[in-house]
């Protein structure tokens, strides 16, 4: 667990070309530069909030997630691990975590395939923006129920 794969893999039915196992470290090194920029952006957003910058940050997190999927560094659990990483990046700027429900998986996979096969990130960005809003609404509803229980 936690070791990079030492074999080539593919995602059946997606058409997505994944990094050869020998290219995992070089590809991750390239992505590290973008991730370091994201971490600085998060700091700046927390120091000087701007909705436009927050949305740009969200979109950039999503693109990084797509690129990490194409590297596919582990033999198993890449999707869960990468979504967890994106959720951590969201948390760094106060955004809620997102969870993909079973009935949303097809839409998510179609958007991810469009991003990874055509470099068209619009659908996956839109999906994540919707999911962030969805998470905010769910959180507000949950806190209302907690308040009602607390005062009854």
Give the role of each language-model region.
Residues 1-76, 80-152:
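FIC/Doc superfamily catalytic core
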